[in-house]
Amino acid sequence: IVQADPAICGGYSEWKKIAAISTANNLKLAPHGGGNIGAHAVASLPQGLNVETYPGLRAAGAKVMKFFEIDEGDILLPNSPGLGLEIDWDAIK
């Protein structure tokens, strides 16, 4: 199982290159690190395995931004542009 982290391997574009190499070698992918970028990365792949999520971090982050929703273990990706992060600027102030 390949666990490249999109946040530290050079970004999403580099992660997709790693995914292509993994696909060519019939390897599963489970990106290291949770969050919206990992969820979108896994959703874009036929061999995507799972996405890490951290309930405590999600609860803390929920005070300033909206994350993807989880319903009975399934991630519900937003239809909004980009990664779907919505920052509550009033909460940050």
Write out the residue ranges for each language-model feature:
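Shared catalytic-loop signature of beta/alpha-barrel
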Residues: 1-81, 86
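Active-site and glycan-interaction determinants of carbohydrate-active enzymes
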Residues: 89
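Active-site microenvironment of metallo-dependent hydrolases
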Residues: 92-93
